[in-house]
Regions:
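Catalytic Walker B motif of ABC-type/P-loop ATPase nucleotide-binding domains
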Residues: 156-160
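The feature captures the beta-strand-to-loop junction immediately N-terminal to the Walker
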Residues: 35-37
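ABC ATPase C-loop
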Residues: 148-149
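Helix-to-loop junction immediately C-terminal to a conserved catalytic motif
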Residues: 50
Length: 238
């Protein structure tokens, strides 16, 4: 069942230790949530798994192969997908274009709309809109998450997917994650403070000061985490 292993991962930035000897095994068919205080290294860990950042030391093993030095593109070809906390803009590219690029095939508008509806966007008008500042932060975030889902990746990484979206969209997104949790044959890894996302997880990883403080099954970890509410944010939305 072993799929992804991080061995003794360390990472520094400006002489500050961000991640300190991280050892972690992620298995197929599991939904993981990484949580912890702000500044604990959660997003950095996600970016290292995707290849956006490179560790100063340690190894990343994917299905028995050392991928530590592989680029983002090379990892994407292996089935890694990533949704940023702050989505990027694509001047001159429409939402429909972006979804087609994500799928890698010619798709019909109905297929694209089906992907958007999963993240709470129901209007066909969005397909013609450009990925630029005319879209709100919440809209950009939902569209980016849709592109990750479109790729059907083996390892899907979502960095705080709840950031910048309204309550209705978050409820819709929670249902998407529930579906992923029950049907995915790969690994889903979500960075989140939100109780409703924590309650979907098979396992929760608690980071603190760049180290894994605790990892365990949802029932066990939720009890621990809610004893210290600093790890969990109130559900405030736009």
């Amino acid at each position: 069942m072993l799929m992804l292993e991080l061995k003794d991962i360390c990472f520094e930035r400006a002489n500050k230790k961000i991640l300190n000897h991280i050892n972690l095994v992620l298995e197929k068919n599991k939904f993981y949530v990484i949580t912890g205080p702000n500044g604990s290294g959660k997003s950095t860990l996600a970016k290292i798994i995707m290849g956006i950042e490179k560790p100063d030391s340690g190894q990343i093993i994917f299905e028995g192969k050392d991928i530590t030095n592989l680029s983002v593109d090379e990892r994407a070809k292996l089935g890694f997908g990533f949704a940023f906390q702050q989505p990027v803009h694509f001047k001159g590219i429409t939402v429909f274009d972006l979804l087609k690029l994500a799928v890698g095939l010619e798709i019909q508008e109905e297929d694209a709309l089906r992907l958007l509806k999963k993240v709470g966007i129901t209007s066909k008008e969005y397909l013609k809109r450009e990925i630029n500042r005319s879209l709100s932060g919440g809209e950009l975030k939902r569209i980016e998450i849709a592109t990750v889902l479109a790729r059907n990746p083996y390892i899907a990484i979502f960095d705080e997917p709840e950031a910048g979206i309204d309550l209705w969209s978050f409820q819709s997104l929670t249902e998407v994650f529930r579906e992923i949790e029950s049907t995915s044959n790969g690994i889903t890894l979500v960075i989140s403070h939100q109780e409703r996302i924590l309650n979907i997880a098979d396992q929760i990883i608690l980071l603190e000061k760049g180290q894994i403080k605790q990892i365990g099954d949802r029932e066990e970890m939720v009890k621990t985490i809610f004893k210290d509410s600093s790890h969990v944010e109130e559900e405030n939305y736009e």
